């Protein structure tokens, strides 16, 4: 984002807080397209095959697109003529997609500027380790052991495009950008619904920005009520409140909330809760009674339906009791387990046995869902029996082995925090045998004959790499005793969900 701001220093549109003129700057397209393409390539899934990421940037295409935007009537194409109307070999949907990439980059500028201004004068240290997904899990491992209920909420999507436009009004000041955004959004969705496949990947950066702005609006009200009712003040909440007319709107909302829902207001008085949002869901952990958890549940339902005009069913909010139910969280199944401990204490000639019960959070691997994901990608059948990967037989032996090793190491890396490694070994076994069957099929041989010819050294690649790193971290005696395989290890370099989790 600093690179974009450097180019905008000499642009008068930035100083006047107008974003609309930036749509007609050719250098913005160069920066936005390069930034978006690099982001897509960096997040490419190891399971995706033949994905269309090879669209070339062309200055001629951008110039033609800018000329079309000067005459917006030329951008409006009837639905029946979507496939026929094209120039330079591209349909109109391609140009709406380019505009959406540009819009996502441009509108992120006021977000970043206000975010930077809110942190000025505050000594907040950046911790890059907190960006890791695994940094959340040990935090919950320490906190959830003292709680008994978790509210699992599926965050709803807005059912109408106009809701997204209204949310952006608090961030974008000029009306021209909002009108242009509304026009392109409706035209883009009309093109998409007409002839685009459901599973095609279309500008995830743009829709991720829209989704985050939608969720940010919901969390602002929730955190505001939480902050008003709590005696503990957190400076990190202030980032969410620097918007136009926000305090006036919230003050009115708070008065209506107090007058119409006096009973529920007592619910918000100083509750001890933890809130985490992840992958389209959020969890609210607290140590309350079932009655209070049901009040929290209907509070979320009323908040979404009454104040955000989003149809939200109560079935989308699940109340989980950690001692009995499993919580699906970031690809793990978490639950509380009681570990009885017997401590012998001796005082003079008398000895006592003291029974202590320690609550521990179990993080298990959801083996059934992962096997389902592996079966969907043709690594095994629905029962978990390995099969050959027929679509990879055209590659070289080195490429096939390298792809399987990379998948296996990524899974081991992600699920290293599991409390029971038996399911992890089963997943490794499926991938190893699938690799052998794929190589044997490519060489037109049987599995037994293939292993006899190459020996057991073929599978050593699956065992090296991560095990070598762990042997350097832990003492040799500890590593040799095999106790390492029963220890949960959290890594602080995991920034994305595992691909098998995304397939759920």
From Swiss-Prot:
One of its GO terms (cellular component) is chloroplast. InterPro entries: Domain_X, Maturase_MatK, Maturase_MatK_N. PANTHER family: MATURASE K. It comes from Arabidopsis lyrata subsp. petraea. It comes from the Eukaryota. Keywords: Chloroplast, mRNA processing, Plastid, RNA-binding, tRNA processing. This is Maturase K. The keyword Chloroplast applies. GO terms for molecular function: RNA binding.
